């Protein structure tokens, strides 16, 4: 059991295709912990409401894990958003603020019978302030992103000022693997999982898929586990023509032209 802890939150950063999101979700699932997840396209209002509800349900001593996947969009898309999470990850009196009038939304939720959301808004409405302010001292953030948060060239100067503060408040892990290691990680995930449980790939199919990725790696548009899942989809749905679909879908246009 951990005796002391200087930082509660974690950033896992690295290029696409090395299993960051998959492995993080796998650990969360194995731990059977209370969590919520946000990905690319999550609006500030959606994050605030779900976070408010999750925190409002916590008892003393309980913890809520919040996975911020695709954080290049969810956390680091602009200065205002990054600044919100900077305060949410502060050591002393941390909070997540949604400084938008939610009274109209509250009335709509009440009319629709969504008392869970009404109660979440009421729980964190602060007299004299607009919107809701959610204490995050019982929240543990896991941030998964592609950009190197220690490299100022990855951000505008203004955004980086907030990013620096976030990194200072987290355990930061940058994963930079050469392609052989990245491929090995993908192959390991594929070997131990089924992209589609109801239509399992055989061991031979898995080897063929992983071998194709190994051979084509430098010319592939993307090498993430999502690509592996899509390749498995073609293999299952089109057993006689999946290789042509792989080539058409996953090989860079420039590589195709060079091979002509």
Descriptions of predicted regions:
Residues 182-255:
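Conserved AAA+ ATPase small/helical "lid" subdomain
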Residues 21-43, 96, 105, 109-114:
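Conserved P-loop NTPase mechanochemical-coupling segment
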Residues 79-136, 146:
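Conserved catalytic/switch belt of AAA+ P-loop NTPases
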Residues 137, 154-178:
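A short helix-turn-beta junction within AAA+ P-loop NTPase domains corresponding to the substrate/partner-engaging
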Residues 69-71:
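Walker B catalytic acidic pair
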Residues 61-66, 135-142:
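Loop/turn-to-beta-strand initiation segments
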Residues 18, 30-64, 73-77:
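AAA+/P-loop NTPase substrate/partner-engagement loops
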Residues 4-24:
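Walker A/P-loop nucleotide-binding motif
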């Amino acid at each position: 059991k951990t005796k002391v802890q200087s930082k509660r939150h974690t950033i896992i950063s690295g290029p696409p295709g090395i299993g960051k999101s998959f492995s993080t979700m796998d650990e969360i699932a194995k731990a059977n912990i209370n969590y919520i997840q946000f990905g690319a396209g999550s609006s500030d209002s959606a994050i605030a409401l779900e976070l408010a509800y999750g925190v409002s349900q916590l008892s003393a001593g309980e913890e809520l894990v919040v996975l911020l996947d695709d954080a290049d969009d969810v956390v680091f898309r602009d200065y205002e958003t990054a600044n919100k999470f900077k305060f949410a990850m502060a050591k002393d009196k941390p909070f997540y603020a949604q400084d938008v009038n939610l009274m109209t939304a509250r009335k709509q939720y009440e009319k629709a019978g969504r008392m869970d959301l009404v109660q979440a808004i009421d729980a964190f409405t602060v007299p004299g302030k607009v919107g809701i302010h959610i204490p995050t001292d019982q929240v543990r953030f896991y941030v998964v992103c592609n950009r190197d948060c220690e490299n100022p060239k990855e951000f505008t100067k203004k955004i980086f000022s907030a990013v620096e503060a976030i990194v200072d408040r987290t355990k930061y892990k940058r994963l930079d693997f050469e392609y052989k290691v990245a491929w090995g990680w993908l192959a390991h995930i594929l070997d131990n999982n089924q992209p589609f449980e109801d239509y399992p790939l055989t061991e031979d199919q898995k080897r063929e898929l992983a071998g194709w990725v190994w051979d084509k790696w430098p010319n592939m548009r993307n090498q993430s586990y999502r690509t592996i899942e899509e390749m498995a989809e073609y293999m299952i749905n089109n057993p006689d023509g999946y290789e042509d679909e792989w080539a058409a879908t996953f090989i860079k246009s420039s590589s195709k032209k060079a091979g002509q």
